[in-house]
């Protein structure tokens, strides 16, 4: 059973000083910069971008 390198094995949360364990906006235990494309446009012309404060990829608010 291997432990994720970003995960504190005792509490299974990001290690001290690190931001995240996984997610489309998490790389090497840190949030990707705000404005990094996390989901390319698929026909609607709108891409989704990382916020720089969460490992999730929020839906572009202009997508309807």
From Swiss-Prot:
User: What tissues harbor this protein?
Assistant: Expressed by the venom gland.
Source organism superkingdom? Eukaryota
Q: One Gene Ontology cellular component annotation?
A: extracellular region
Q: Where in the cell is it found?
A: Secreted
Name the keywords, alphabetized. Answer: Cell adhesion impairing toxin, Disulfide bond, Hemostasis impairing toxin, Platelet aggregation inhibiting toxin, Secreted, Toxin
The record's Pfam families line, in alphabetical order, gives: Disintegrin
Question: What is the disulfide pattern of this chain?
Answer: 6-29, 20-26, 25-50, 38-57
InterPro entries, alphabetized: Disintegrin_CS, Disintegrin_dom, Disintegrin_dom_sf
Any one Gene Ontology molecular-function term assigned to this protein's record: toxin activity
Q: Does the keyword section mention Disulfide bond?
A: yes
Position of sequence motif Cell attachment site: 42-44
> Where is each Disintegrin domain found?
1-64
Alphabetical list of SMART domains matching this protein? DISIN (SM00050)
Q: How does it assemble?
A: Homodimer; disulfide-linked.
Similarity comment: family membership: Belongs to the disintegrin family. Dimeric disintegrin subfamily.
Tell me the function of this protein.
May bind to both alpha-IIb/beta-3 (ITGA2B/ITGB3) and alpha-V/beta-3 (ITGAV/ITGB3) integrins, and may inhibit platelet aggregation.
Listed name of the protein? Disintegrin schistatin
Organism classification = Eukaryota, Metazoa, Chordata, Craniata, Vertebrata
